[in-house]
Amino acid sequence: MSVNEQKAPELQEKLVQVNRVAKVVKGGRIFAFTALTVVGDGKGRVGFGRGKAREVPVAIQKAMEAARKNMVDVALDGTTLQYPVRAQHGGSKVFMQPASEGTGIIAGGAMRAVLEVAGVQNVLSKCYGSTNPVNVVRSTIKGLQAMKAPEDVAAKRGKSVEDILG
């Protein structure tokens, strides 16, 4: 049994988008489906994947496998973010801000799916520019990945956490 198969039961999987695409050939059109999925353990690990196939279930399965292989760690502060963060990918710009307990996930569409599977429970967020789900997912993960824990920053600078936090 591989590592991915052992972790599979505890992973949360969300389907973000299914899109039908067409290849035009001499005899007509050939249709295929693309799927965008996000996978996370709810404890600070999240990944996304894309799959393409002639049938929807196969495309979703391929996307889930790609998402499991593509997981990254996110430094969370309990159920929220460490500090406000901005990120951009392509035309999509996202802004995410920590929120107090009980606020919930204030985010839309693709960004909400990423935050839910990552284990974030309280966050204020906004997406600017393009709302293309692929770019929103990429920029959200890029922003989450860019956050560093105070312990990491303190160790890198050779100072204590109290000096860093003021």
Curated annotation (Swiss-Prot):
Top-level taxon in the UniProt lineage: Bacteria
Alphabetical keyword list: Ribonucleoprotein, Ribosomal protein, RNA-binding, rRNA-binding
Keyword field contains RNA-binding: yes
Span of domain S5 DRBM: 11-74
SUPFAM superfamilies per record: dsRNA-binding domain-like (SSF54768), Ribosomal protein S5 domain 2-like (SSF54211)
Record has rRNA-binding as a keyword: yes
GO biological process: translation
One Pfam family this sequence matches: Ribosomal_S5_C
GO molecular function (one): structural constituent of ribosome
Signal peptide, first to last residue: none
GO cellular component: small ribosomal subunit
Chain's role: With S4 and S12 plays an important role in translational accuracy.
Protein family per UniProt: Belongs to the universal ribosomal protein uS5 family.
Record note on domains: The N-terminal domain interacts with the head of the 30S subunit; the C-terminal domain interacts with the body and contacts protein S4. The interaction surface between S4 and S5 is involved in control of translational fidelity.
Subunit structure: Part of the 30S ribosomal subunit. Contacts proteins S4 and S8.
The protein's name in its UniProt record: Small ribosomal subunit protein uS5
Annotated source species: Marinobacter nauticus (strain ATCC 700491 / DSM 11845 / VT8) (Marinobacter aquaeolei)
